From Swiss-Prot:
Pfam family, one: Ribosomal_L2_C
KW Secreted (keyword) present: no
Gene (UniProt): rplB
Protein's GO biological process: cytoplasmic translation
Bias (Basic and acidic residues) ranges: 229-246
The keyword RNA-binding belongs to this UniProt entry's keyword annotation: yes
Family statement: Belongs to the universal ribosomal protein uL2 family.
PROSITE patterns associated with the record: RIBOSOMAL_L2
Keyword annotations of the record: Ribonucleoprotein, Ribosomal protein, RNA-binding, rRNA-binding
Function: One of the primary rRNA binding proteins. Required for association of the 30S and 50S subunits to form the 70S ribosome, for tRNA binding and peptide bond formation. It has been suggested to have peptidyltransferase activity; this is somewhat controversial. Makes several contacts with the 16S rRNA in the 70S ribosome.
GO molecular function: rRNA binding; structural constituent of ribosome; transferase activity
InterPro entries linked: NA-bd_OB-fold, Rib_uL2_dom2, Ribosomal_uL2, Ribosomal_uL2_bac/org-type, Ribosomal_uL2_C, Ribosomal_uL2_CS, Ribosomal_uL2_dom3, Ribosomal_uL2_RNA-bd_dom
Region ranges (Disordered): 223-274
Protein name (database record): Large ribosomal subunit protein uL2
Organism in which the protein naturally occurs: Verminephrobacter eiseniae (strain EF01-2)
C-alpha cells in the first residue's frame, strides 16, 4: 500500500491524505455474509440523545466476521481481500475445503491464493490461528481471545498486534501495543502476525464533512455554550472554565483513572505506560 497526498484543488482537498486500495476487491461483498445495520443515531426509543456526537452517516451493511476461527484442520484458501466500512482493518474472504466461506480479519502481507489453517496442529505462519499454548514465546500475534471460545477481542484494528512474552502454568503473559502486560489463559486462541492496513494511521480526512459521512457529529466546547447547557458556559466575552474541567453533568473529566473493574484487575501484570 501507499499513501497519496491529494492536489489542493479546493480547501476540502488541500489537506487530504489517502491510503491506496488497488489490491482490494472492487466488486460487491459476499451477500450471504451481509446483515442489515440500522442507524441508531445515539438515540433511545424515546428519541432522546443517549450518546452524544452520533448521527447521520453513510448507510452500509455489516460484514459477519469470523472471530472464533474454530474450523480446525480444514484448509481455507484466500479468495480476495476487501474493504470493510465497519472497521479500520481490511477483511479477507476465505473458502474452506468443505465449501464454506467466511470473512476473517486480514493479517499483514496476506496474499490472494494463500492457504490458512486453524487448530493446535496449524503451522506457525502469518494468518494461522492456534491456542496460545502452541504459539512460540516471542511471537507477534493479533485477534486474541480473552476467554477460551469467546472469539477474538484484543488487537483487531488496523496495524494492531501484541507480543507473547511468557507462559506460566495455565496463563500466558501478553504485552499490548500500549505497554500493558496482561495474563491470558493458554487455551485462548490467537492469530499469528499483525493486522493489515497498518498505514491507516497516516490518513488525513481533510474536511469536517468526512466525519459526517462516518456518522460523527460536531463536538461543541463547554465554554462556548450557555450556562443552562454546560457548567463551563456563560460569561461576558471569552472566558475560561472558572473551575476544574467537568462534563455537562458536572463530573470531573481530566487527570484521573476511569478504570474500575476489580473482577479482572488480577489479570493485569503491569499497567500501560502514559
Amino acid at each position: 500500500m501507499a499513501v497519496i497526498k491529494m492536489k489542493p484543488t479546493s480547501p476540502g482537498r488541500r489537506a487530504v491524505v489517502k491510503v491506496t486500495r488497488e489490491h482490494l476487491h472492487k466488486g460487491q461483498p459476499h451477500a450471504p455474509l451481509l446483515e442489515p445495520q440500522f442507524q441508531k443515531a445515539g438515540r433511545n426509543n424515546n428519541g432522546h440523545i443517549t450518546t452524544r456526537h452520533k448521527g447521520g452517516g453513510h448507510k452500509h451493511h455489516y460484514r459477519v466476521v469470523d472471530f472464533k476461527r474454530n474450523k480446525d484442520g480444514i484448509a481455507a484458501k484466500v479468495e480476495r481481500i476487501e474493504y470493510d466500512p465497519n472497521r479500520t482493518a481490511h477483511i479477507a474472504l476465505v473458502c474452506y475445503a468443505d465449501g464454506e466461506r467466511r470473512y476473517i480479519i486480514a493479517p499483514r502481507n496476506l496474499e490472494v491464493g494463500a492457504t490458512l489453517l486453524s487448530g493446535a496442529e496449524a503451522p506457525i505462519r502469518a494468518g494461522n490461528t492456534l491456542p496460545i499454548r502452541n504459539i512460540p514465546v516471542g511471537s507477534t500475534i493479533h485477534c486474541i481471545e480473552l476467554k477460551p471460545g469467546a472469539g477474538a477481542q484484543i488487537a483487531r484494528s488496523a496495524g494492531a498486534s501484541a507480543t507473547l512474552l511468557a507462559r506460566e502454568g495455565t496463563y500466558a503473559q501478553v504485552r499490548m501495543r500500549s505497554g500493558e502486560v496482561r495474563k491470558i489463559h493458554i487455551e485462548c486462541r490467537a492469530t499469528i502476525g499483525e493486522v493489515a492496513n497498518e498505514e491507516h494511521s497516516l490518513r488525513q480526512l481533510g474536511k469536517a464533512g468526512v466525519k459526517r459521512w462516518m456518522g460523527i457529529r460536531p463536538t461543541v466546547r463547554g465554554v462556548a455554550m450557555n450556562p443552562v447547557d454546560h457548567p463551563h458556559g456563560g460569561g461576558e466575552g471569552r472566558t475560561g472554565e472558572g473551575r476544574h474541567a467537568v462534563d455537562p453533568w458536572g463530573n470531573l473529566t481530566k487527570g484521573y483513572r476511569t478504570r474500575n473493574n476489580k473482577r479482572t484487575q488480577s489479570m493485569i501484570v503491569s499497567r500501560r505506560k502514559k
